[in-house]
Amino acid sequence: MLSEMLGEIAALPMVSLLGAALIVVSVLGRRLLVSNIAWAITGQTPAKSLAKRSRLPGLPFKFPNGQGTEKFFGGRSAARRWRIQYGPIYAIWAGLKREVVLSTPEHVQAFYKDSHLHVKATDNNSGWLFAELLGSCVGVVSQGRWKRVRRPFEHPFSRPESLTRPKAFIHEARDYFAVLNPNIQELTINTSNDLKHCPFFMVASIFFGIHTTAQRDELKQLGPPREELFRHAFMGGMNRYAITKYLPGSALALLRQFQGKWEGFVKAAYNRSIQTGDGTIVPLFEAVNRGEMSMQELLQTLDESLFANLDVTAHAVSWNVIRIAHHQDIQQKVRIEIQANNNSEKSYENYVCRDDTLLAACVLETSRLHPVLPFSNPEAAEEDKIVGGYIIPQTDVIVDTHAINIDNPHWVDSNSFDPHRHLGQKDSSRRYNMWRFGFGPRQCLGKNVADIILRIILCEMLNTYELGLLEEEGITGVKLQPDSWIGLPNGVVQMTPLKLDE
């Protein structure tokens, strides 16, 4: 451990070592001085106005995280506050990294039209812990490396392959609800806590096939420490700066423990899949053996698809169930639509794959009103960009998702839940007016299966239950979990078995 620590400290860039100097001046409370020191240490060039050559407005640096923690744990309220104070384009600090925030579709289009050439922040501007967890996964690597790592994963998540998966997904969903409510009786659930593993196991089936009970139990046991690691990463502090990773209280020991257990699980699942011929883990392992990607890239991309997305998919499922439970008129129309397309298993499977249904529109509208993150993940262009009258000098850029999805004149009566607005609408009209899977050519690998999974979960619930939101204040009464980095809703929904004639 000591030799590892000394070796890493020797290799640290000067920015990490000098960052400690900010502690002293931070204690003195001189915010302008701290911000100027941060600019000097990082050597970053600030964005400037074309006309006045003035700096882009933005928030001052605050040690140790800048606004990097607040943008996750309090991002929804912070985004509105910052936009009101600084305008539609401004800058924040994520640790010692400057991030330019865009808030209008025009600015987003100007920046993201060549996103496949952009460079992602390998640590998500969150520090060493995030980098060690996911710094080599397909969602974070860039350019040539991104193309290389993505290639082995493209087939399992392609549109044609995704259309073959509903049968397996339906089986997973039915198994899940059979365990959740075996006697099909009236049940009250917390939408986030009780449903979070349903989409998780559906995605896991893509990689590992039909799970054994032991595999399901092991995956569940790996979840809590992995969630804790993500909370540590986004909380920052000593888990942000590499020089502090060996100090008492860092998450290094928990990280090493998780990584060892995760690698052991994946290798055991690979050996089982060789025997069963089930799952895509075998061809992915073969890609590692051929040198097409490293073992670290494989393990971290699997982690990204499962554990990093555990709360992401839980957020999406939870809000979809909350919305359909609250809007009883829409719920009844969707149920009628489901029943009309449930004459056979094949008809049902085809239905959940269609994009022109009221069910599909409900999923889209929920995603619009409840984006999973307050801000998109940071990425930088290879060349200077002119956006909104400012020169952005190869600096990381993020998007205020609430500003795009809701506070956007493109959406009429934008705060209302109106799934019908999406029926007959072309994807091109949403391209820069709705943040969901990313902007431009480079988008989320799992976007082809995500909607199918959400639709199936809603269908399986609505086929069996009447859903009702147990909040006197309706949607506005749903509170967010305070320790959740993604803002999981604490929605309470009552599942009442349908009568036979319904």
From Swiss-Prot:
Induction of this protein: by what?
Answer: Expression is regulated by the cluster-specific regulator verZ.
Task: Enumerate the GO terms in the molecular function aspect.
Answer: heme binding; iron ion binding; monooxygenase activity; oxidoreductase activity, acting on paired donors, with incorporation or reduction of molecular oxygen
Listed pathway(s): Mycotoxin biosynthesis
Does the keyword field hold Iron? yes
Topology term for the membrane: Single-pass membrane protein
Location relative to the cell: Membrane
Q: Which UniProt keywords apply?
A: Glycoprotein, Heme, Iron, Membrane, Metal-binding, Monooxygenase, Oxidoreductase, Transmembrane, Transmembrane helix
Pfam families reported for this sequence: p450
Q: What is its EC number?
A: 1.-.-.-
Q: What PROSITE patterns does the record point to?
A: CYTOCHROME_P450
Q: What is this protein called?
A: Cytochrome P450 monooxygenase verC
UniProt lists the gene as: verC
